[in-house]
């Protein structure tokens, strides 16, 4: 039960402060990876679209 409560608190806190999660800055040593990190959230969408392209290629069997 305490695990569910702590998970609920974590989710509630991330809803209250979403900007700290989505707009956190990388440390200065990793600043060269900023363009890659900005692009990374889009990558799962490509897999989702690839599934549709694949099904279209096999005629949605």
Swiss-Prot record:
* Quaternary state and interactors: PSII is composed of 1 copy each of membrane proteins PsbA, PsbB, PsbC, PsbD, PsbE, PsbF, PsbH, PsbI, PsbJ, PsbK, PsbL, PsbM, PsbT, PsbX, PsbY, PsbZ, Psb30/Ycf12, at least 3 peripheral proteins of the oxygen-evolving complex and a large number of cofactors. It forms dimeric complexes.
The UniProt keywords, alphabetically, are: Chloroplast, Membrane, Photosynthesis, Photosystem II, Plastid, Reaction center, Thylakoid, Transmembrane, Transmembrane helix
Source organism per UniProt: Triticum aestivum (Wheat)
Task: Set out the biological process GO terms recorded for this chain's protein.
Answer: photosynthesis
Q: Which domain of life is it from?
A: Eukaryota
In its keyword annotation, does this UniProt entry include Cytoplasm? no
Coiled-coil ranges from the UniProt annotation? none
The identity of this protein, by name, is Photosystem II reaction center protein K
Q: Which GO terms describe its cellular component?
A: chloroplast thylakoid membrane; photosystem II reaction center
Name the residues that span the membrane.
32-52
SUPFAM superfamilies xref list = Photosystem II reaction center protein K, PsbK
């Amino acid at each position: 039960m305490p695990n569910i409560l702590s998970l609920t608190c974590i989710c509630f806190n991330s809803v209250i402060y979403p900007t700290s999660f989505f707009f956190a800055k990388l440390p200065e040593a990793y600043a060269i990876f900023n363009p890659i990190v900005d692009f990374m959230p889009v990558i799962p969408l490509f897999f989702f679209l690839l599934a549709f392209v694949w099904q279209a290629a096999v005629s949605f069997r």
